[in-house]
Design a protein with these regions (language model features):
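Short loop/turn and capping residues at structural boundaries
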Residues: 4, 106-107, 218
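Short linker/helix segments within small regulatory modules
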Residues: 218-224
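Short cysteine-rich clusters marking metal-coordination/redox-active sites
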Residues: 207-210, 224
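Secretory pathway export signals and precursors
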Residues: 22, 203-206
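FMN-binding flavodoxin-like domain, especially the glycine-rich phosphate-binding loop
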Residues: 1-35
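Basic, polyanion-binding surface patches
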Residues: 31-203, 214
Length: 224
């Protein structure tokens, strides 16, 4: 019943601003209305909070590490932690074989190079710790020398096949707090660590997990 009258011509840029304002004002109203809401908006899952972690393992010949954002404490008596890993990652195979892993909690001072080191190359073909100073926990696995605020050594107690991913349900065999810096969240990474792309005239792909940007028409076979 309410209406707004605009008595002068509206420029294109102003029209777009008005449309954007209208969309913003209506967004919450529509989402709460059962007859108007999009009830299959799976971007709602993006609102789940995630930390970012480096999971380290060893295949018997070399150390390996990968970035994950799916680490969850399940219980506290006994302590149980779940770690989900994509089956296509080499670390999934290694941890299935060995049954042990370390979870390194990245802190907010971790630079983008950490994500390049552990997220943009495969441990099948690259030694991710070559030339690095390393520390080892009681289980013999690496924990990072910097850019973490804590780490946990885990022993796999149960494996759950989730199709594309595997869930490792683990007991905690060792846990250390390194410092009091805040844990790196996925949101913090997106807003403060990930380089902002220059997209004009370029084609590429953006990883929905870590934000890595690959420029090109097709993805290489070794990028998951």
């Amino acid at each position: 019943k309410n209406s707004v009258h605009i008595w002068s011509a509206v420029k294109e840029e102003n029209r777009k601003q008005i449309e954007a304002m209208t969309d913003e004002l209506c967004k919450e109203y529509i989402a709460k209305d059962n007859s108007l809401a999009n009830k299959n908006d799976m971007t709602a899952l993006f609102r789940i909070g995630y930390g970012l972690y480096v999971v380290t393992s060893n295949d018997g010949k070399k150390d390996n590490g990968l970035i994950v954002n799916t680490v969850t404490q399940l219980t506290d008596n006994p302590y149980r932690v779940a770690v989900n890993i994509n089956k296509a990652n080499y670390s999934h195979h290694v941890i299935q074989q060995t049954g042990v892993l370390n979870v390194n909690c990245l802190s907010v001072d971790a630079p983008f190079s950490v994500f390049q080191q552990f997220g943009f190359q495969s441990g099948r073909t690259v030694d991710k710790f070559a030339g690095e100073k390393v520390n080892r926990s009681g289980n013999g696995l690496i924990f990072l020398d910097k850019y973490i605020n804590a780490f946990m050594s885990l022993k796999v107690e149960q494996y759950v096949d989730l199709g594309t991913h595997g869930m490792f349900i683990c007991s905690v065999t060792e846990a250390r707090v390194i410092n009091d810096r805040d844990t790196m969240s996925y949101t913090y990474y997106q807003q403060n660590v990930k380089p902002q792309p220059e997209t004009a005239g370029k084609k590429g792909f953006v990883c929905k997990v870590c934000g890595y940007i690959y420029e090109g028409d097709e993805l290489p076979a070794d990028i998951i």
